[in-house]
Structure formats: C-alpha cells, structure tokens
C-alpha cells in the first residue's frame, strides 16, 4: 500500500504538466523529420519508415509492462529512472550511425516516454479529492500539448539544424524535465515494498473483472477514440480528393487540437463539481453534434467547426473517465491507468 500524504500546489501541478509536455513531445519529434532521416540513410528506407510505428509500439509496451509498477515502487524514483532512460534514448537517437540503430532507440524512447502516464496517476493521488478532476485535466493538457509541440517544433528545428539537432533538443529538454522532477516531486513511502512482478500483471485481469466502472469507462473511451481516429484517417484523402489540398492543410487543421488543451482543465473542474457522468454525457453530445456537422455541412468551414466540436467532446469524455477510474482504487491507480490507456488505444 502507498502513503499519499502530500498535496500538490497549483504551481507544482503546472510543472507536472510541463514535464508531461516535454516527455510526450519526444515521441512525436521523428514524425516531422522522417524525410531528413531518409536523406541521411538512402539505402535504409525500410528501416526509416518503421521509426514512427516502432516508437508507438515501444509506448504500448511501456504502458503494459512499466506503468503497473507505480503501484508498488516509490513513484518519484520510478519516474526519475524512466526520465533518465528517455534522456539516454534521445542521445542515442542523435548519435545513431544507421537507421537500424535509430529504430532501436525509437523503441526505447517510446517505452521510456510512458513516464507521462506515471505522472498522471501520481498527480491524482496527491490532489485534493474536490480538485482531482481539475488536477488531472491540467496535467493531461501537458500531454496534449506535447503531441502538438513534438510535431510542430520538431519540423521547425529540423529545418534549420537537421534531424540530429531535433533529437539533441529533445535530450536537452528531457534533462530540464529531470531537474524539475528532482525539485518538485515528493518522496512517497510504500508499506508493501516487496512484490511479484508476474502477480502484478495478473492482477490487471482481476481488476478488469472486479471493477465494472473501469470496464464502462474504458470501453466508452475506446469507442469514442475510434470515432475520433476515423476522422484523422480519412481527412487527408478527403481534402486531397475534394479540394486538392496537401499535408500542410491537414496539419493546420490538426493544430485545432489546441482546443483540447483548453478543454481538459475545464472538463476536470466540471467533473469535480457536477460529477464525471454529466461530463461524459456532454462530451458524447458534442461528438454526435460534430458528426452531424460533418454530414450536413460539407465544406471547409464545416470541417473546422466539426473538428473543434469533436476534439472538445473527446477531451471532455477522456478527462471525466480518468476522474472516474482514479477515484476507485487508490492502491491501484497505475494499474487502472494501464487498463484504461491500453484498451483506449486498441479502440
């Protein structure tokens, strides 16, 4: 069992969001510089094309095999170690002599970057019950900002300093995140420091079986995430077919995801005051309205309005569902987070 006696100040909550932004950005840096990497390794196109996928596979592996450890290992130490591995992985990417080596460090980057998903349940544990939703929303804003920043900043740095400069920048920012971790995270004590790792993994199945609210929240989120993903799968083809637009316009529309950064803390605060169920209903209504707009308002303006509604709705439901699962089992928040995130990404 864990002793969570510390409370986070608003400044520390904001800093946790910044840490999450930094580490998540490292996952997405490679997506905007693949063409530059391919130029350095013209005979390894196959390996270069695997880099984004392998990074995401590493993230999935980290979600399943590393995040549950936060219920048993002192979280500050675990977060610090993962951040240190992430720093070394970014250095490895910068120095990679071949694309194959780059693929290996991409996997390591994805796995270590799940440190962000160690931080979210930690923030929930250290927040006041009456402000848990707002805290989770603020930290998740950092995660969302990291996704956008990784793609945008990666491309900008790559244009002037090359792809190695991008990964060097990621390493430097990760070093800054490590400094913040050392400064702001309190040490927490565990009353049961010994554990069986296989038993930890087996307990995931028991939690899924015994916690119906977890099943409801995760399955709801998986279905809505699938709805969200469908749009971004077909949007580039629709824009190219109907308007002959390229990737630049798709990227500009993706930047509308900034609305999610603004919605997350608001959704968390609403969940604290009114309960997460109402926030879930509100978010689902927004997403249904978004698809109605896509269907009836077949234009670029309609697409913009629909994207704003869809993104806002998805984030509202996400934060509300996280509020629900983090309120269930204080001793199992990391494992519940593993179930939630893994099932969501399957959707």
Q: How should these model regions be labeled?
A:
Residues 115-127, 316-329:
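Intracellular juxtamembrane helix-capping segments at the cytosolic ends
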Residues 105-143:
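Cytoplasmic helix-loop-helix junction between adjacent transmembrane helices
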Residues 277-321:
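C-terminal transmembrane helical hairpin of 12-TM major facilitator-type secondary transporters
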Residues 2-6, 185-218:
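Juxtamembrane intracellular "pre-TM" segments in multi-pass secondary transporters
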Residues 101, 138-185, 234:
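Helix-loop-helix hairpin linking two adjacent transmembrane segments in secondary transporters
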Residues 63-74, 262-275:
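Helix-to-loop junctions at the C-terminal end of transmembrane segments
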Residues 61-99:
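Conserved MFS/SLC helix-loop-helix module at the cytosolic interface between two early adjacent transmembrane helices
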